[in-house]
Every structure is written in C-alpha cells, then in structure tokens.
C-alpha cells in the first residue's frame, strides 16, 4: 500500500483563515502543512504535524524548507539561461548539503518551467508543482522524467476531484497533493480520497478445512486496535507465511460476551501476520504499530495497534487445503474466535468442521525477515 500524502497550503490570507485550514487538516489526518516561516511555531501549538515553510534558510526550524516562492519557481525572478546559475537551485543545493530536508516549489507556466522543475527534482527531497491552469500532462512528464530519482512529487490541486486524478496519473501517480482550498469539506474529501487509494485490494481464495484438533494450553495473542471493524473484517494470520487465514474481528455479540469490534483474537505467539506486503510475528507487535485490516472482498485499510495481550489459553489446530497447498493456523479454542467463510460469513472455530470452506491468502516464495524472497522452503 503506497502512501499518498496530503499537504495543506496555508501561506496566504490572515492567520485566522490559515488556522481554519490547518485545524481542519489536523483533525482529518493531513500529513503536512505549508506555511510562511513566521507561522511555524503557531502551527506546532495547534498539534503534532509535519510543518513545511517557504524559505531560503532553516532559521524557522521547519521540518521541510521549500525553496521557490518569490524566486524563479513561481516566476518572480526570470528562469536562468543555465541551471548552475539558478538562484533557487543553488539555495536548494546549499540546504541539502547541510542535511536539511528540502522541497522545490515550481509553478508550471510553460515547457521551460517544466524542465526547470525536473532539474529541481534531482536535488530536492520533495518537488511541489502546480499549474496556472490545471493540466495532467506536466505531471505525466515529470513522473516519467523523475521516476529514477528519490524525489517525491507533490502536485498542486484545488479540489478532491483534482487530487484523485493526480493520484492516478500514469501507473504510479503523484506521491501526494498540495491542496489550496479553504473549504473544510474539500479538505476532508481530499484526505479521504488519499486514504481510499492507499487501500489496495488483495486476492483471497477459498480453502477446504481438512482438520480441526484441540491442542491443549499455549500462549495466544490478542491484537486490540484503535479502529472499529465490521463483520467480515479481520487480519491475515497463519503458521506459514505462504498461506494465511482471514481471522474475523470480535465484531459479533455472543451469549457469553459483548462484541469487541476493535479486537482480533489472532492466534498463537509463533504465528505470522500479514502487514502490507510484509509479514511479522504476532508476538513482536506492540502499541503504535501499523497493521493491515482486510475484509472478505480483499479490500485493505491500515489499522493502529492500541494494545497487545498475550495470555495462556486452550488452543486449536486448523488445517485446510487450497489446491495442492496445505495451510495451518493455531487459534484459541473459544466460541468467539472465527474464521471468515467463503461467502463472507464468519464461522466460529468451535463449530468448524471438515469440508467447511474458509477464506485464505496464498503467496509464492519464502520470507526473510518478513520480506518476500524467491526461495524454496517447506513449512509444516
């Protein structure tokens, strides 16, 4: 899931107008705000967020210094005949050499500004580009020109609709958008669009249960998140990284206990959990870690661990076959622990039987420190 960032542009108008943009961004989950140097500390008083400032030095203490305003980038100064003579390029280079995180700001007026932006992108950590009239073509060209560089391209937009287009341009899209809008709903919608596009889908398939066996006592892990999950949502858990079961959240009421929709009673301490395109051991998770929440259609979203509970409980072995692959998971033996059935309906492990079909995720290759590698490995 490639993260798409949303920056809020708040460098014009009075402080009260800027403050409204910033607070809406903070409350909605924006990633960064772009302000003038004199407003950096004011932003920090409002909340904890990355602060970028238009400047040519780092006296403001901003997290990111953005070069280009009142320079060549926005057309205040003419573009140089040669890049080595550029006012903005030299300023960005000096800051980069000092270890400062630098953004380059360029307003695309014509092809010459597009070429200038590409040069800034080779120096800066972030390239903030916007247009006098919004067009996709300059963004496509810059993505193509800078695809081998480490720079992140942040494209200037004025609406959530423009943001969606920027995120989806070419295969990769912009890394983020710089939203210039004082409309609170537009800010919320843009951030929502970014988060939805981060939520890639993963392919799930059904496996046939071949064995259900009580094992006795062992240590199991509950993942309590800062997120509320729906029926059919949970996490991918298993004893093999090559194949994991969709374990349902405790989102259903039962005769014995109230629903805890923030929780996935995930499995024994040795188990793998799939997070993004990597795996981790359940037992190494801790508060503040990111996890991947997935539903029965394969749609993913990010969750945050609020607490991990490891307790001794009776365990149960679940074995299933998908094609010629045999998968296993060891879960707590309790009525409230459920796998997700083929049709998206949760099935309690207490009622699970041979022949039932449950949703799983299959992977090829092996894992080395959680990363997928091409290697033959047998896990039983």
UniProtKB/Swiss-Prot annotation:
GO biological process annotation, one example: amino acid biosynthetic process
Positions in coiled-coil regions: none
InterPro entries named among the record's database cross-references: DHQ_synth
Reaction equation(s) it catalyzes: 2-amino-2,3,7-trideoxy-D-lyxo-hept-6-ulosonate + NAD(+) + H2O = 3-dehydroquinate + NH4(+) + NADH + H(+)
Keyword flag Acyltransferase: no
EC number of this enzyme: 1.4.1.24
Keyword Oxidoreductase: yes
GO molecular function, one term: 3-dehydroquinate synthase activity
Record key words, sorted: Amino-acid biosynthesis, Aromatic amino acid biosynthesis, NAD, Oxidoreductase
Matches recorded under Pfam families: DHQS (PF01959)
Family, per entry: Belongs to the archaeal-type DHQ synthase family.
Function: Catalyzes the oxidative deamination and cyclization of 2-amino-3,7-dideoxy-D-threo-hept-6-ulosonic acid (ADH) to yield 3-dehydroquinate (DHQ), which is fed into the canonical shikimic pathway of aromatic amino acid biosynthesis.
Name this polypeptide is given: 3-dehydroquinate synthase
Annotated source species: Methanosarcina mazei (strain ATCC BAA-159 / DSM 3647 / Goe1 / Go1 / JCM 11833 / OCM 88)
Lineage: Archaea, Methanobacteriati, Methanobacteriota, Stenosarchaea group, Methanomicrobia
Gene encoding the protein: aroB'
